[in-house]
Design a protein with these regions (language model features):
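Short, conserved active-site loop motifs that form the nucleotide-linked donor/cofactor pocket
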Residues: 116, 143-144, 203
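Short, glycine/acidic-enriched loop or turn micro-motifs at the edges of active sites
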Residues: 99-101, 125, 152, 209-211, ...
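Acceptor-substrate binding/catalytic loop of class I
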Residues: 125, 182-187, 232-239
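Glycine-rich adenosyl-binding loop in Rossmann-like folds that engage adenosine-containing cofactors
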Residues: 56-82, 141, 146-196
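Short helix-capping segments at alpha-helix termini
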Residues: 113-114, 136-141, 224-227, 253
Length: 274
């Protein structure tokens, strides 16, 4: 059986998908399954698949079958999807910061149509390429793709690109002294304030930047002072939690955690008290 047959079986058979998901949660079985997938499926393989359920049902995505099959079930970061859907209305301007391969941007763009705006921010060139493919395949070309890192300053930053198996292929911004690996590249950076002044003020922001959340917010002072958007933010460690929550409280926001677990990463929902 070749790797395409393996992918086809796992992606089309609901019983097989459920067995595969459950088995992955058992240490010994999960390890065996991962070893099998590594042997059967090339690490850089990409196949077109349609999301089967949830808010993204029917959307086509170009995914890596070894590491990204969870997107197909339609419940990846379900709490974020619920917040997104309940706050998409005519006139919404959505900033997807750390868009990865653009799934949330696609969901937002399809729901808003011409009645809103979607901006996808992503510094990794390979992910940017996939966002463009997804927008084209799903006829959602109105998504504005900003191929830059979002930070507290406009300029250039070092970005550590991730492999597929590393945190769902999400890279991180790194200090210059740490950016010595071959996979580290230099990328343009921009503040959200700069984008808002040039284009449109956001009403809804999603942030997932692997630990650089505070820097994103520091470059968004004008937005949170004047536009006061709803914020959904993935927090990756205790220090980021402290920095982000303090920053929000000082600007008149209240927040709640979307998951009951206290383990990181976890998602924060913040709304303006006024």
């Amino acid at each position: 059986m070749n790797w395409m047959s393996v992918v086809q079986q796992l992606s089309t058979s609901l019983p097989l998908r459920k067995i595969y998901t459950l088995a992955n949660r058992v240490p010994i079985l999960g390890s065996a399954l991962r070893n099998f997938s590594r042997a059967a499926i090339p690490s850089d393989a990409l196949v077109w698949k349609s999301i089967r359920s949830g808010p993204g049902k029917g959307l086509w995505i170009h995914l890596n079958p070894r590491y990204e099959m969870k997107y197909l079930e339609g419940d990846y970061e379900a709490s974020v999807e619920r917040i997104l859907l309940s706050n998409l209305r005519p006139g919404t301007v959505f900033y997807d910061v750390g868009a990865h391969i653009g799934v949330f941007s696609l969901i937002a763009a399809r729901n808003l149509g011409v009645q809103g705006s979607v901006f996808a921010f992503e510094p990794d060139p390979s992910n940017v390429r996939r966002i463009k493919e997804h927008a084209s395949r799903n006829q959602l070309d109105a998504i504005r793709i900003i191929p830059k890192a979002v930070s507290c300053t406009d300029g250039r930053l070092r970005f550590q690109r991730a492999s597929f198996q590393s945190s769902m292929n999400r890279g991180v911004l790194v200090e210059e002294t740490l950016a010595l690996q071959e996979s580290a590249i230099e990328v343009d950076s921009i503040t959200l304030d700069a984008v808002a002044r040039e284009h449109a003020w956001p009403t809804l922001i999603k942030i997932d930047v692997e630990g650089s959340e505070a820097a994103v917010l520091q470059g968004s002072e004008e937005i949170f002072r004047f536009a006061k958007p709803l914020l959904v933010c993935e927090i990756h460690h205790e220090q980021a939690s402290s920095d982000v929550t303090r920053w929000l409280l000082e600007r008149g926001y209240k927040f709640q955690w979307l998951e009951s677990s206290t383990e990181f990463p976890r998602h924060l929902l913040a709304t303006y008290l006024g």
